[in-house]
């Protein structure tokens, strides 16, 4: 007699057992059935029976929960999504760091009355994730006994209204939904954006039609319906709480944004899902950068949503740059081989099934090798580039670990702002202190009051600071305070309040511009001309780094640099000897509490004639940049430069007269020569008989 050892390559006992159980309605059948002593039990109870040898005590509630399953044509099946079933099938993402909210929600659901929780929190904090976590907890049995056999069904409110154009259709749909829930006995409804139930389905007050909230109230009060809702704080206050009869039937569960550490753990928990989806490797430092950059550069949104979106955006961008073409083919082939294997087992063709199994193993090895060789690894710089694409902030040029840039900020500013070394050094010290992390985090990056005569470089220093910090001279929100010299101009800063014209249109206000561009220089030009009420508002910005607009939104100024300029106390007759005490000179123009709010009050000195030698080179470099667009190069002789300085120097007016002279003597003459000789591309400016002349450069 031949002894069967189980090692026959064509016969596998596992395949025989699985096929036998499938034919008996057990393993791998569409509806597994387990009968013990004539009693049908669930797969979980059968597993318990195999381990202990004892059948669990039968309960009517458990039996009912198994038998009363929604029909295929029911409202629940057509309009709802069974989150508990998706959790059983492993289709839901893991939920991390929300144990408290899940526990609070489960405890409210386990109450005898008023067991309808509403999750309230800002957009993106993870309210829906809490419900998905609750569904997973129900599947795992980590919930109170009262809700162990419950099924959470998500209902889209808009789908309830679809197709109910005839009078009474909406009410009939809702009544059918309530009846199905009552008959099932184990259904918990989940309404996302639950504030929409107020007014949903209702028409005019004369038609007699009822809204969704009015229909649900009796069922909620009698406990016939268990409901979970999710909405934002503003919508909950403006809709649910205004309806006292509806509000008392709900219990609020606050969902706050997770901390940076919790968000990092959330990203670690879902990392595999995004790596498999995009075929991109996401190391820990990339996850940390996604959290840090989203907090720092996307303040208007909430964690963890903004960090997850930033990570997803980065992975999608890298996947688009490194497309994977043959991986889908391998996965499709594996699916075909699995189907072929199952058909072969069903026909008891074990030789063919073994061949398919071998082919599947080979394909899986190819995918593993493919992943190891083809997967692209994301870097912190990729996250920075994603932030730059999303917000326009040049993060790659603002890396906080670039200590060399902080060390050289003073020399870079001095190369463009001439003759104001003390002012530049004071600004550089404040910026270094903040960017190195040794400053108060709630105030702006820096707040400065530039005082001094006109034309000495106050505005130019602000432009160069914007270029060095934020990568562009255009990163300046410039306000001419002469336009804010009356009390009504407050609306230009924060917008109008409710009831006034322009309440909904605050696009050009300071608060709205900072909200859209949180990394910028806020330049308050000629601050002494502003109304005292404007100064009062600015006190809060300088001290707390925030300002509340007319619609109640708090705008964060902590990533801005506030620069106010003034030439108050500096007239045309000023001399160097009269500039003894800067505070004595500006005190008559500003309130003490306003001056005390600035990090530094910086005095700008009059320019000397030797300073203009460097300034004229900078201005002529700008002229060369302009002519280069036409393909023209310009050379200027030293005597021509000296002539420009002699014409443009004015001790009281600063460098502005020099700019005018260059426009008249250089730009205008180049224009005239170009119109007469458009073919000439090399020009030279020389001094001839006391006059500046433009001619062709033959060298």
UniProtKB/Swiss-Prot annotation:
Binding positions for ATP per the UniProt entry: 121-128, 452-459
Keyword Electron transport belongs to the record: no
Location of region: I: 76-325
KW Nucleotide-binding (keyword) present: yes
Cellular component GO terms, alphabetical: cytoplasm
Annotated spans, II: 380-570
Family, per entry: Belongs to the ClpA/ClpB family. ClpC subfamily.
The protein, known as: Probable ATP-dependent Clp protease ATP-binding subunit
Gene source species: Streptococcus pyogenes serotype M6 (strain ATCC BAA-946 / MGAS10394)
Lineage: Bacteria, Bacillati, Bacillota, Bacilli, Lactobacillales
